[in-house]
């Protein structure tokens, strides 16, 4: 470990963590495709926090745009069941760090440790739907809901995280995005046309996994994935087949043997530890035709959610998220300038001054305000000094 002014440099799993001196006691807690997450102690508040390093955010325009999108979403979406952005800073090595409240575990780890009791299944489902109602009202689709993106603390408070794949509600969408087990069939069938209903399919898969303790559709590849979905739901109806854009996909679906659906109360007959209403809600989420799939707002009014449903405490987002940047094809340096601006804006809006442990240094602010921001074309080598 070494210290350089306001920043301390530590190597974790071969990765340099260069964070402000406000955060101490780093310990790795998770690794993803785009970042490493460490727990830390916030010396200012005394709270445990999660510090996420975004790996090489300016190495390509695609990664820069993805990071910018996640930052914009975290700033805009403020809800009890969504992870909130407590701090963000840019290190001297030009890595970006997001700081959030540390949650004790995630649903994936919880499910692999022990079976869930029915009251926890019900409460977790309610909180996921409550968060989704808010996300969808902002004009946002999460696109990557899965147990590892559902964070839970010791009080069973639940927060949805990882908005890096989130996308505008748009009839033309891009291909494979979510972990296969939780991927809606319309993503596999059409690749381009889907909406908020893909998230409800994912919730159905998560609910089934909480009930049975194992993934409902553990496909080995997308062909196998679709095949085992049809084992439960039967062959897709003609109106769904008519939406398939790809000729290859259409030929594949038409080549499958006809299958009749299995009634959900028969498929889950052994799951006597949960209420029949849970299976009924599950059946309303796992429907081939997304237009017939239940919405998050409607799911909150389902009888299974009755013990927790409170229409006065299930807010929507007051303003739609601004997606105007999303179709932009910009060079890395432009995304970098936009990112600097968002970081500075975050600290100004939050009212974070020097007395409160400001993470953006005066040197950074001066750098941000320079005309053109003469940033390096390539990220600097990350070497521990």
UniProtKB/Swiss-Prot annotation:
The modification Phosphotyrosine is found at residue 176. The TXY motif contains the threonine and tyrosine residues whose phosphorylation activates the MAP kinases. The active site is at residue 144. Dually phosphorylated on Thr-174 and Tyr-176, which activates the enzyme. One of its GO terms (cellular component) is nucleus. It is found in: Cytoplasm; Nucleus. Its cofactor is Mg(2+). Gene3D superfamilies: Phosphorylase Kinase, domain 1, Transferase(Phosphotransferase) domain 1. Proline-directed serine/threonine-protein kinase involved in a signal transduction pathway that is activated by changes in the osmolarity of the extracellular environment. Controls osmotic regulation of transcription of target genes. This is Mitogen-activated protein kinase HOG1. GO terms for biological process: cellular hyperosmotic response; cellular response to oxidative stress; filamentous growth; negative regulation of cytoplasmic translational initiation in response to stress; negative regulation of exit from mitosis; negative regulation of G2/M transition of mitotic cell cycle; negative regulation of induction of conjugation with cellular fusion; osmosensory signaling pathway. A motif (TXY) lies at residues 174-176. ATP binds at residues 29-37, 52. One of its GO terms (molecular function) is calmodulin binding. Its main location: cytoplasm. Pfam families: Pkinase. It comes from the Eukaryota. Belongs to the protein kinase superfamily. Ser/Thr protein kinase family. MAP kinase subfamily. HOG1 sub-subfamily. It is an enzyme of class 2 (transferase). Keywords: Activator, ATP-binding, Cytoplasm, Kinase, Nucleotide-binding, Nucleus, Phosphoprotein, Serine/threonine-protein kinase, Transcription, Transcription regulation, Transferase. Activated by tyrosine and threonine phosphorylation. The modification Phosphothreonine is found at residue 174.
């Amino acid at each position: 470990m070494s210290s350089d002014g306001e920043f301390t440099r530590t190597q974790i799993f071969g990765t340099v963590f260069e964070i402000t001196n406000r955060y101490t006691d780093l310990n790795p807690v998770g690794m993803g495709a785009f970042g490493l997450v460490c727990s830390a102690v916030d010396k200012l508040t005394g709270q445990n926090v999660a510090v996420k390093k975004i790996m090489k955010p300016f190495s390509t325009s695609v990664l820069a745009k993805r990071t910018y999108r996640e930052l914009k979403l975290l700033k805009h979406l403020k809800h009890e069941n969504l992870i909130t952005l407590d701090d963000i800073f840019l290190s001297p090595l030009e890595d970006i760090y997001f700081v959030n409240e540390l949650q004790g575990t995630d649903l994936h780890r919880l499910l692999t440790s022990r079976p869930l009791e029915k009251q926890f299944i019900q409460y977790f489902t309610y909180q996921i739907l409550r968060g989704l109602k808010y996300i969808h009202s902002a004009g946002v689709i999460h696109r990557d809901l899965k147990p590892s993106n559902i964070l839970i603390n010791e009080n069973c408070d639940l927060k949805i995280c990882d908005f890096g794949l989130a996308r505008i509600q748009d009839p033309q969408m891009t291909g494979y995005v979510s972990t296969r087990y939780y991927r809606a069939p319309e993503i596999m069938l059409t690749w381009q046309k889907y909406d908020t209903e893909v998230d409800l399919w994912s919730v159905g898969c998560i609910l089934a996994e909480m009930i049975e303790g194992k993934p409902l559709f553990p496909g080995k590849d997308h062909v196998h994935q679709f095949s085992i979905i049809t084992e439960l739901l039967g062959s897709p109806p003609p109106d769904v087949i008519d939406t398939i854009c790809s000729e290859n996909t259409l030929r594949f679906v038409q080549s499958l043997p006809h299958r009749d659906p299995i009634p959900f109360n028969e498929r889950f007959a052994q799951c006597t530890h949960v209420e029949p209403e849970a299976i009924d809600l599950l059946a309303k989420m796992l429907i081939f035709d997304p237009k017939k799939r239940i919405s998050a707002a409607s799911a909150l009014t389902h009888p299974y959610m009755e013990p927790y449903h409170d229409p006065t405490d299930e807010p929507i987002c007051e303003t739609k998220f601004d997606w105007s940047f999303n179709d932009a094809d910009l060079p890395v340096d432009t995304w970098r300038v936009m990112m600097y601006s968002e970081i500075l804006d975050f600290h100004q809006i939050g009212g974070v001054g020097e007395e409160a442990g400001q993470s953006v240094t005066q040197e950074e602010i001066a750098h941000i305000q320079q005309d053109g921001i003469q940033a390096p074309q390539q990220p600097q080598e990350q070497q521990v000094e």
